[in-house]
A protein has these predicted regions:
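Long, contiguous binding/interaction regions
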Residues: 1-140
Length: 140
């Protein structure tokens, strides 16, 4: 059983840009929409060429792949519905709250920042038992 990490991700910017992100992501944070896993990675019985390819790329299991590319064991869970606040005609914030296993999803946050240069990304995380915390602001 992992230590759970509580994450809050805020995306702020032009309403059309922020809402385009929300429309693409949906009500809940889903790492597969940011960094999609290989389609064949999750088959119960991998073919020999799949096993060889995974071994060659150093990602033989779904758990190893997700930890490498998402920074956490599983996709987001215990997610809350996104909260959208329209502050003005030119300013909107979308807030996603979710948990992750063991750590914050740093590669996912970095990918969101890279994929959405016109949105300011902030927020942060707290590890279960307050064993650590950090900010997403300015992460690249």
């Amino acid at each position: 059983m992992p230590n759970h990490t509580q994450n809050t991700l805020e995306l702020t910017g032009n309403p059309q840009t922020v809402m385009a992100f929300v429309d693409q992501m949906g009500k809940h944070m889903d790492f597969e929409k940011v960094i999609p896993p290989p389609a064949n990675m999750f088959r119960e019985n991998l073919r020999r060429q799949d096993v060889e390819r995974c071994a060659r790329e150093g990602i033989p299991t779904w758990q190893d792949w997700q930890r490498k590319h998402w920074g956490t064991k599983w996709n987001a869970y215990q997610t809350e519905d996104v909260v959208v606040q329209k502050w003005s005609v030119n300013f909107t914030t979308a807030t996603y709250r979710f948990q992750t296993a063991w750590d914050a999803p740093r590669p996912v946050i970095a990918a969101i920042i890279k994929q959405n240069p016109d949105i300011e990304v902030s927020g942060g995380y707290v590890l279960e038992g307050y064993e650590g915390c950090g900010s997403f602001y300015g992460m690249t």
